[in-house]
Amino acid sequence: MPKARVTKNETAPVSSNPSANRTPVKINSAGTPMWYKVIMFAFMIVGLAWLIVNYLVGPQIPFMADLGAWNYGIGFGLMIIGLLMTMGWR
């Protein structure tokens, strides 16, 4: 009967402790700093406030009246920045 081919893994010495062969990796378990969370939620809240103010009194505020429909872009843009920041939150 023909003998099976021996692979490299079968000829390598087997350690009694499998974790001894691994390189330790330092894990940063500190999480997200407080300032990151504050800025993230601030972007979302300021964007929402911008849209609410624009809807309620936008035509009465001179610079908001000049911006016109760009107020929606500014409000939603601020909220999207906050939403994108949630991807880095741990």
UniProtKB/Swiss-Prot annotation:
The chain crosses the membrane at residues 38-58, 67-87. Keywords: Cell cycle, Cell division, Cell membrane, Membrane, Transmembrane, Transmembrane helix. Its main location: membrane. It is found in: Cell membrane. Residues 9-22 have a biased composition (Polar residues). Disulfide bonds: none annotated. GO terms for cellular component: plasma membrane. One of its GO terms (biological process) is cell division. Belongs to the CrgA family. This is Cell division protein CrgA. The lineage of its organism: Bacteria, Bacillati, Actinomycetota, Actinomycetes, Mycobacteriales. The gene is crgA.
